[in-house]
């Protein structure tokens, strides 16, 4: 997805982890191709990113024009490059980031972002989208009305603070179309993360319940 026109310049090989930690190598094959080695998909993505940065001198971020455009032959590494991760768990994101632009991203934006996460070695991304679908189902199973639950939720840009039990209803009610759309999007996000050997961090119950629950219990 990042450099599709140059895929025939690369060879992917699997190697063992180093003392239980992710490791990658960049080398040259006998027929002059660029070899990216890693102990899993994430490590290969890291090798690819390091090749782009240190050998091809090209940077990629989630705002980059994708795919990248590199004219001519790709440069070869002078010697084998090997790197091992110093930490087993590499976490990224925080609760509040899901109230900035994340609530309004489509799949195309998320796909680029997830590629960037993998290329930079993140294996424990916090992924909080779509959880309102779960809570909607839970509160309905307790006998609450859908309209009351929608009014309890905050609007998209304020959901992080609602999820932390700081506020209710602000900027709401939350449309069912948004709840369903974020749920579908989250399933695609999680599937892609797992394809790239990530283990996404998901939310648990924070103890925050709708006021209307008092009318039922």
Residues of each region from the PLM?
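Aromatic-lined carbohydrate-binding surfaces of glycoside hydrolases
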Residues: 2, 14-17, 33-37, 41, ...
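Residue-level recognition of short, structured coil/turn motifs
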Residues: 3-4, 57
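N-terminal regions that are enriched for targeting/export leaders
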Residues: 5, 10, 15-29, 73
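Surface-exposed patches in mature extracellular/periplasmic domains of secreted proteins
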Residues: 7-11, 60-64, 128
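N-terminal helix-rich structural modules
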Residues: 20-23, 35-36, 45
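Short active-site loop/helix that positions an aromatic residue
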Residues: 42-55
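The feature marks proteins involved in alpha-glucan
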Residues: 56-78
């Amino acid at each position: 997805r990042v450099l599709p026109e140059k895929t025939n310049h690369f060879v992917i090989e699997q190697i063992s982890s180093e003392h239980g930690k992710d490791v990658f190598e960049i080398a040259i094959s006998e027929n002059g191709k660029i070899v990216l080695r890693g102990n899993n998909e994430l490590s290969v993505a890291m090798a690819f990113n390091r090749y782009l940065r240190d050998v091809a001198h090209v940077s990629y971020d989630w705002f980059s024009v994708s795919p990248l455009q590199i004219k001519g032959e790709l440069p070869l590494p002078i010697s084998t490059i090997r790197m091992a991760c110093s930490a087993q768990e590499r976490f990224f994101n925080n609760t509040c980031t899901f109230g900035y632009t994340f609530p309004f991203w489509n799949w195309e934006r998320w796909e680029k972002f997830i590629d960037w996460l993998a290329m930079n070695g993140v294996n424990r991304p916090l992924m909080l989208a779509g959880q309102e679908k779960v809570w909607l189902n839970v509160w309905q199973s307790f006998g609450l009305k859908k309209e009351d639950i929608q009014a309890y939720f905050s609007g998209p840009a304020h959901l992080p603070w609602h999820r932390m039990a700081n506020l209710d209803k602000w900027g709401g009610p939350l449309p069912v179309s948004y709840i369903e759309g974020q749920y579908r999007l989250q399933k695609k996000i999680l599937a892609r993360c797992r394809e790239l050997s990530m283990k996404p961090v998901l939310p648990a119950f924070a103890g925050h319940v709708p006021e209307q629950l008092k009318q039922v219990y």
